[in-house]
UniProtKB/Swiss-Prot annotation:
Keywords: Cytoplasm, Lipid biosynthesis, Lipid metabolism, NAD, NADP, Nucleotide-binding, Oxidoreductase, Phospholipid biosynthesis, Phospholipid metabolism. It catalyses: sn-glycerol 3-phosphate + NAD(+) = dihydroxyacetone phosphate + NADH + H(+); sn-glycerol 3-phosphate + NADP(+) = dihydroxyacetone phosphate + NADPH + H(+). PROSITE patterns: NAD_G3PDH. The keyword DNA-binding does not apply. This is Glycerol-3-phosphate dehydrogenase [NAD(P)+]. NADPH binds at residues 11, 30, 108, 141, 256, 280, 282.
Length: 332
């Protein structure tokens, strides 16, 4: 199978390395200097340093060439751009005059200005593209790059997209499950990042494992309430792309969103944290969108509201936690 991966950040690079072990894989980035470095060293020293990439993996800064590779009859196109760049990439794909027949995306979050999920952005920008889906689940790029075991879910209303994605990714240490709840999978992948900031704050304040467990459990309830209101199915949120991804992102030390919370608890400013991080922390980008959607649906999301208060309203982390503890008692 031919596979084109659009986006050479940490996640796109790790997935391309996995795919290249079995398939004819081309990794694209618009940054010619990044591509030149990949071609010279077979390592993404900018986003995934220390991980050797397969010799068979090819690289290109020409989007047209990458799209042609991913548009072959036996091909799959993987969009690994962040949500913030998804619409721009779709514009570029359309302008290139080559939209692959089968597309799967791996970005997580809501578009900041519109509060749209990735599938809604793609439907608006590439309406002719019908065989598409989302690949998501509990996964750190570095561990995938190290070929450590991982389980992911592809969700699509297209059986052909599910089967093609399964054929592309299900090998080696990667196990793929299939489903059709695109909305549920995307909401889980977005909201868990916000909740991971909350658990990072709690851990950074030294509030203990009991508090962490409470935040994860009640955070899952928030995720499920919003997801069902937006059209997802409740059972999706107890699976890999909901609870599984939440546990990993909230507790794993490789989590950028958890790191943001830890650093906020230590008294650092958000600008300083993001500047030092050097990578996208999607929880920061989409927290306000999550809260706005919850309010539009009249859904109570107190943990998400507390995170937004710390991120954007100058509320001290410890005061935000105190506010959660002072909430009126209620039935679970």
């Amino acid at each position: 199978m031919k596979v084109a991966v659009l986006g050479a950040g940490a996640w796109g690079t790790a997935l391309a390395g996995h795919l290249a072990a079995r398939h004819d894989t081309l990794l694209w980035a618009r940054d010619a200097a990044l591509i030149a470095g990949l071609q010279a060293r077979h390592e993404n020293s900018r986003y995934l340093d220390g991980i050797a990439l397969p010799d068979a993996l090819r690289y290109d800064a020409d989007l047209g060439a990458a799209l042609a590779h991913g548009a072959a009859d036996d091909a799959l196109c993987v969009i690994a751009a962040p949500v913030a760049g998804l619409r721009t990439l779709c514009h570029a794909m359309r302008d290139a005059g080559c939209v692959p027949a089968h597309v799967v995306w791996v970005c997580k979050g809501f578009e900041a200005d519109t509060h749209l999920l990735p599938h809604q952005v793609i439907a608006a920008e590439l309406p002719e593209q019908q065989s598409n889906g989302v690949l998501s689940g509990p996964s750190f790029a570095r561990e995938v790059g190290q070929s450590l075991p991982v389980a992911l879910t592809v969700a699509s209303v297209s059986a052909e997209c599910r089967e093609r994605t399964l054929a592309a990714f299900h090998h080696g240490a990667m196990r793929i499950y299939t489903g059709d709840d695109v909305v549920g999978v995307e909401v889980g992948g977005a909201v868990k990042n916000v909740l991971a900031i909350a658990t990072g704050i709690s851990d950074g304040l030294g509030l203990g494992l009991n508090a962490r467990a409470a935040l994860i459990t009640r955070g899952l309830a928030e995720m499920s309430r919003l997801g069902v209101a937006l059209g997802g199915r409740a059972e999706t949120f107890t699976g890999l792309t909901g609870l599984g991804d939440l546990i990993l992102t909230a507790t794993g030390d490789l989590s950028r969103n958890r790191t943001v919370g830890l650093q906020l608890a230590a008294g650092r400013t958000l600008n300083d944290i993001l500047g030092a991080l050097g990578h996208v922390a999607e929880g920061v980008r989409c927290a306000q969108a999550v809260l706005a959607l919850a309010r539009a649906q009249s859904i109570d999301m107190p943990i998400t509201q507390a995170v937004c208060g710390v991120l954007f309203d100058g509320i001290a982390p410890r005061d935000a936690v105190s506010g959660l503890l002072r909430r009126d008692a209620r039935a679970e």
